[in-house]
Curated annotation (Swiss-Prot):
SUPFAM superfamilies: GST C-terminal domain-like (SSF47616), Thioredoxin-like (SSF52833). This is Glutathione S-transferase stcT. One of its GO terms (molecular function) is transferase activity. The keyword Ion transport does not apply. The lineage of its organism: Eukaryota, Fungi, Dikarya, Ascomycota, Pezizomycotina. Pfam families: GST_C (PF00043), GST_N (PF02798). Substrate binds at K52. Residues 83-211 form the GST C-terminal domain. It is an enzyme of class 2 (transferase). It comes from Emericella nidulans (strain FGSC A4 / ATCC 38163 / CBS 112.46 / NRRL 194 / M139).
């Protein structure tokens, strides 16, 4: 019997950690695809009135929205740190990913694929904002293998899902060579079987996706 149902779509940055944790904990998840909030059915809007993803519905009918909450519910104690400070730091980096990196990255990427209006000035600003936030991660990871503590935590899996699109479409070899702390961390965490099983092998950009209107 499934642990529950996860409403999401392929390559959704907010869902990778949820899927990886479920895989690691042998929690079978039924996946239902929601391609866009514009296509959300009335049934789905009853679960999540904003029509956003992901949304989790447990086998017992328990409904949970917001990716951080779902990831925490899905997780086990081994991924949540060993002290109160580590737990707080894990939440900190998850929040940093979802509130700081993802909106900036979306402002860079979405106009290039027609998902948002194309305004070059705004896109360049979003690019600068994204790279500044990734620099914070790169600096933090100096001398560290993981974001929090000495072992893998939920923060690593969650932030990996947030930044994988940047590595796939924008962060070319030159950038990766100049930011080895973050790049090495990305390669290390993405190589984990629980990640590869749900996301496939990493795809690394050969060149930065150009800022030009979508064709």
């Amino acid at each position: 019997m499934p642990f529950g149902t996860l409403y999401t779509r392929p390559f959704n940055p907010r869902s990778l950690a949820i899927l990886a944790i479920a895989k690691a904990n042998n929690l079978p998840l039924k996946i239902k695809t929601i391609t866009s909030f514009k296509d959300a059915t009335e049934e789905y809007l009853q679960l999540n009135p904003l029509g956003k993803i992901p949304t989790f519905v447990g086998a017992d009918g328990y409904v949970l929205t917001e990716s951080i909450a779902i990831a925490l519910y899905d997780s086990n104690t081994t991924l949540l740190g060993t002290t109160g400070q580590e737990y707080a730091s894990i939440i900190r980096w998850m929040a940093f990913g979802i509130t700081e990196i993802l909106p900036a990255l979306g402002g860079w990427f979405n106009p290039l694929i027609g998902r948002a209006n194309f305004n070059a000035d705004n896109i360049y600003q979003s690019k600068d904002d994204t790279l500044a936030r990734l620099k914070i991660l790169d600096n933090h990871l100096c001398g560290r293998e993981y974001l929090v503590g000495e072992t893998l935590s939920l923060a690593d899996l969650f932030v990996l899902g947030i930044v994988q699109g940047a590595f796939r479409f924008f962060l070319d070899k030159r950038w990766r060579d100049e930011h080895r702390n973050l790049s090495t961390w990305f390669e290390r965490v993405h190589a984990l079987p629980i990640v590869v099983d749900v996301a496939g092998p990493p795809v690394l950009a050969e060149y930065e996706m150009p800022i030009q209107p979508p064709k």
